[in-house]
């Protein structure tokens, strides 16, 4: 076993040859490299599979022996300063390694078909392999310096992939937004690392924890400074994991290819922040108020992400806000000290969210056969509907991921989310109420996405729904709008422009809607030889990863079922995390009262089903029959209550669709303020500083011309004037000084 750990340092470097060879091939043999470009997908999958097998083997050994291995070698030694590098293999490392490799392999297989016709195919796989290397290096790091180096590399790969289609201004802007937002957190992380080095004199995790605990025990620290350093460290995790208030980059990151959205949201960039807090939890838990701050940020993000997902029309943005909310649950669990629950939810959410994103990619891929290549149209749920008939396999797997995220047993996320919800009651009743209410919102917005996408009829085939004015099909839904105002930062709804859900207006459906052969939309800038009337199921190379992730979603929750009775122990996760849990909670007891568990499970599942029921009631395919509208309208009549209800709905819509006005606030005050300062600085530089410099030159020129005119071109006159000026200056100096 010791020999196996000795070779674990190679884990981050196994996928590295792919980007290096692709780069060398494009420089030395560009034609051959591009011609045989599909072989790089096989090599990427092969190398990452080797890492996966190695990680699984290490994990099995850790489960059986509860061991932790660390190897360190000194790189720089100078008097009292030494910089060490090494690797740490513990349960957290092995869990993250398996997550990165399993999800990464599925995404790579999926991407081979998804990106097959993209000119940046080679560039994409080079970035992806380097992304895997960076993330594996991050999770195996044994000190804060290595963490920071690989932290920045993970960010670099994320920016490259978010802005992969950099010729599109929207993608370029999203890349810049992610970069600038994460700069704030990364700067805080760097300051926090330097602060704790100044306090303890070490970057190594083991030494750092031990020295810091001794200083705390002996009361030799300035707690205000220590708390500030801890907050700065936490700021890095806030930005990376899209926690409030540095969450604004996450929905815009959907401008990248869909496979990278799956990887970022499941096992890499956003998981890095959760990993950092989990790694530093022995440090945070002994600092006053920092754990409470982590839980507060987590619960705010839980609720904010759920409310912002309610009105999204873009399927990927809806899933992005869902990720934000679920990451908030993990951060809340870490803030409460529920280490096991947080990592359990990290595992289950990773597979469920990867399944949902790859499923959305399959949906987008199929919609492009109708609307052409246009992300604004192919990702718009208002143009979808009825896809269950055309993409049945994608529909089944997407439903599995949706039910899992809703917390429906026995799917994966039910077990992990239920633990967090139960622990929240012991920590704070207020936090518990918010967390449980958000569980219902999660079920609502996830089933909203599912119903708008798969149920009803294909909305892209309908052009008019009553009246002379053409309105989008999705405007009939609860969160609909008549259209998008261009060049407007904020969008609002009022009684004149909104189309209410509970109205007596009938919306006739085109009789020939399902027999149309002409596409609903065409793109002038994109050439396509033929466009299909209906979407079709994706190829097997895209369906295979979705199917495998569906199996993970079904069964991965079993590793954390807290069943330990009569000598039968099914709780693999607790055995796996035993060294870390014993470090944090030496006298912890993982036994569970099953009566209490079943009681809480019934409540949480009931809340989830209530959210599903509301979503089904509001978003079921009512357009196939007007009887549903008549049934609803029989309960609601026009009047003051109806007007008030509509205003409330419109207010909720405006809040959600405009991202809680946080982006607008940042744009107006931060971006506008910085631009105003830049313009003022430019004015001072050009008008004042340059004016002074140019003014001296102009005055010198005028004086010179004057002397030239008075002197008449004679050298004797110039000498006389020069001596006169010198005499005047000497006289003034003598009189004054």
Curated annotation (Swiss-Prot):
Organism domain of life: Eukaryota
Any GO CC annotation of this UniProt entry: chloroplast thylakoid membrane
Residue stretches spanning the membrane: 9-29, 40-60, 89-109, 125-145, 147-167, 185-205, 219-239, 258-278, 286-306, 327-347, 354-374, 396-416, 425-445, 543-563, 602-622, 717-737
Chloroplast recorded as keyword: yes
Compartment(s): Plastid, Chloroplast thylakoid membrane
Annotated catalysed reactions: a plastoquinone + NADH + (n+1) H(+)(in) = a plastoquinol + NAD(+) + n H(+)(out); a plastoquinone + NADPH + (n+1) H(+)(in) = a plastoquinol + NADP(+) + n H(+)(out)
Keywords linked to the UniProt accession: Chloroplast, Membrane, NAD, NADP, Plastid, Plastoquinone, Quinone, Thylakoid, Translocase, Transmembrane, Transmembrane helix, Transport
Mode of membrane association: Multi-pass membrane protein
A GO molecular-function descriptor: NADH dehydrogenase (ubiquinone) activity
Pfam families from the UniProt entry: Proton_antipo_C, Proton_antipo_M, Proton_antipo_N
Disulfide partners: none
Reported function: NDH shuttles electrons from NAD(P)H:plastoquinone, via FMN and iron-sulfur (Fe-S) centers, to quinones in the photosynthetic chain and possibly in a chloroplast respiratory chain. The immediate electron acceptor for the enzyme in this species is believed to be plastoquinone. Couples the redox reaction to proton translocation, and thus conserves the redox energy in a proton gradient.
Record family assignment: Belongs to the complex I subunit 5 family.
Self-association state and partner proteins as the record states: NDH is composed of at least 16 different subunits, 5 of which are encoded in the nucleus.
PANTHER family found in the cross-reference section: NADH-UBIQUINONE OXIDOREDUCTASE CHAIN 5 (PTHR42829:SF2)
Protein known as: NAD(P)H-quinone oxidoreductase subunit 5, chloroplastic
Organism: Solanum lycopersicum (Tomato)
């Amino acid at each position: 076993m010791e020999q196996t750990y000795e070779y674990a340092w190679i884990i981050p470097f196994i996928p590295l040859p792919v980007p290096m060879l692709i780069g060398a091939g494009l420089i030395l043999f560009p034609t051959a490299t591009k011609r045989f470009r599909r072989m790089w997908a096989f090599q990427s999958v092969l190398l990452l599979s080797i890492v996966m097998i190695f990680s699984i083997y290490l994990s099995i050994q850790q489960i059986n022996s509860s061991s932790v291995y660390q190897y360190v070698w000194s790189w720089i030694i100078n008097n009292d300063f030494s910089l060490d590098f090494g690797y740490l293999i513990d349960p957290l490392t092995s869990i993250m390694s398996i997550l990165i490799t399993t999800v990464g392999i599925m995404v790579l297989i999926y991407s081979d078909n998804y990106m097959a016709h993209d000119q940046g195919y080679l560039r994409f796989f080079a970035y992806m392999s380097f992304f895997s290397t960076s993330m594996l290096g991050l999770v195996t790091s044994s000190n804060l310096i290595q963490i920071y180096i690989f932290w920045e590399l993970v960010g670099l790969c994320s920016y490259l992939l978010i802005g992969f289609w950099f010729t599109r201004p929207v993608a370029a802007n999203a890349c810049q937004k992610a970069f600038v937002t994460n700069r704030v957190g990364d700067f805080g992380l760097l300051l926090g690392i330097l602060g704790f080095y100044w306090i303890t004199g070490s970057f190594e995790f083991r030494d750092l924890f031990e020295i810091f605990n001794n200083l705390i025990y002996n009361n030799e620290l300035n707690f205000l400074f220590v708390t500030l350093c801890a907050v700065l460290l936490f700021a890095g995790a806030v930005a990376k994991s899209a926690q409030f208030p540095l969450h604004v980059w996450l929905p815009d990151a959907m401008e990248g290819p869909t496979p990278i959205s799956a990887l970022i949201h499941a096992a890499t960039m956003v998981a890095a922040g959760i990993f950092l807090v989990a790694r530093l939890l022995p440090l945070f838990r002994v600092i006053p108020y920092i754990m409470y701050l982590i839980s507060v940020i987590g619960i705010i993000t839980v609720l904010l992400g759920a409310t912002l997902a309610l009105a999204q029309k873009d399927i990927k943005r809806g899933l992005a806000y869902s990720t934000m909310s679920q990451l908030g649950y993990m951060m809340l669990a870490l803030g409460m000290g529920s280490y096991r629950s947080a990592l359990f939810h990290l595992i289950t959410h990773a597979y469920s969210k990867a399944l949902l994103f790859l499923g959305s990619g399959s949906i987008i891929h199929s919609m492009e056969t109708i609307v052409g290549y246009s992300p604004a149209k192919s990702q718009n749920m208002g143009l979808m509907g009825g896809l269950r008939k055309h993409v049945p396999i994608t529909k089944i797997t997407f439903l599995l991921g949706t039910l899992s995220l809703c917390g429906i047993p026995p799917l994966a996320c039910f077990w992990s989310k239920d633990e967090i919800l139960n622990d929240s009651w012991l920590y704070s009743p207020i936090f518990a109420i918010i967390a449980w209410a958000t569980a219902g919102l999660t079920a609502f917005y996830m089933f909203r996405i599912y119903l708008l996408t798969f149920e009803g009829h294909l909305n892209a085939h309908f052009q008019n729904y009553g009246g002379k004015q053409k309105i989008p099909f999705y405007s009939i839904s609860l969160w609909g709008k008549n259209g998008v105002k261009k060049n407007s930062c904020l969008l609002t709804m009022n009684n004149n422009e909104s189309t209410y859900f509970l109205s007596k207006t009938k919306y006739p459906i085109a009789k020939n809607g399902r027999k149309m052969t002409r596409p609903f939309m065409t793109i002038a800038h994109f050439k396509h030889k033929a466009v299909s009337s209906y979407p079709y199921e994706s190829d097997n190379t895209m369906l295979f990863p979705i199917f495998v992730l569906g199996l993970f979603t079904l069964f991965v929750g079993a590793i954390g079922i807290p069943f330990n009775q009569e000598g039968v122990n099914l709780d693999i996760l607790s055995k796996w995390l035993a060294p870390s849990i014993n470090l944090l909670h030496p006298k912890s007891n993982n036994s569970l009262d099953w009566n209490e568990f079943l009681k809480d499970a019934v409540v949480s599942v009931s809340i989830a089903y209530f959210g599903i029921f509301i979503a089904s009631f509001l978003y079921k395919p009512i357009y196939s029959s007007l009887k549903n509208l008549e049934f609803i309208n029989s309960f609601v009549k026009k009047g003051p209550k109806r007007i008030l209800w509509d205003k409330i709905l419109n207010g909720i819509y405006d809040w959600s669709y405009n991202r809680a006005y946080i982006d607008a606030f940042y744009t107006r005050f931060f971006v506008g303020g910085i631009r105003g300062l830049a313009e003022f600085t430019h004015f001072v530089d050009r008008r004042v500083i340059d004016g002074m410099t140019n003014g001296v030159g102009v005055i010198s020129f005028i004086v010179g011309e004057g002397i030239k005119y008075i002197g008449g071109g004679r050298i004797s006159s110039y000498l006389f004037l020069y001596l006169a000026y010198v005499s005047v200056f000497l006289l003034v100096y003598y009189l004054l000084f």
